[in-house]
Amino acid sequence: SFTLISTDKAVRPTNVMGASKRIAELICQAHAKEKLDIKLDIVRFGNVLGSSGSVIPLFQKQIEAGGPVTVTHNKITRYFMTIPEAAELVIQASAMTSSGDVFVLDMGRPIKIVDLAKEMIKLSGFQHYFSDTPNQVQHKTRHIPISITGLRNGEKLYEELLIGNNPQPTEHPRIMKASEVSINISDLTFHLTRLENACNTHNLGTIFNILNELPLEFNH
């Protein structure tokens, strides 16, 4: 069997990275319809706590440096899962799939990133305060500044786990099966060939046109 590790950023993507993840899902779904000898499934992760590139190691470094701890927006939220939860999702999905399924983990309520920053500062023995800019902070004893830097291009205030509205339960109480749109292999191959040609010629306009034509719900 083959398991694609996808991301919640594939759901109604607002940037090219998220769009590429949704395209990878479509490729797996299309090949699954071809009744191959291999079972294919897809698992969507939120943020994995403690993994390389996650926000917690970044915040730890910023706190150790005396701040500021940088957050892009005071209302931004993200879903989080632990490394054991992520590993369990992959293993369980491989066991449950009938090929072409998209699995997501019930990760509970999303967490405000600014609240995570505050809690990490507190657990490190400091108090937080807010600074207008990351480069102009007031140095206060036992205090760490939090700086709101503004949303990056293509960054969402909140992530979604499902494109469709009717997830199906599975035998695992915390794993759902998503009902997502797919595309047949011939149509997908046609679009991907055009996309490859547009990338090779650096034709940005055509690239975005193709991303909008594919069933990604791309909103850049």
Named regions from a protein language model:
Residues L26, A30-H220:
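Strand-loop microenvironment adjacent to phosphate/nucleotide-handling motifs in alpha/beta enzyme folds
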Residues S1-E25, A30:
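Conserved Rossmann-fold NAD(P)-dependent oxidoreductase catalytic core, especially the SDR/UDP-sugar
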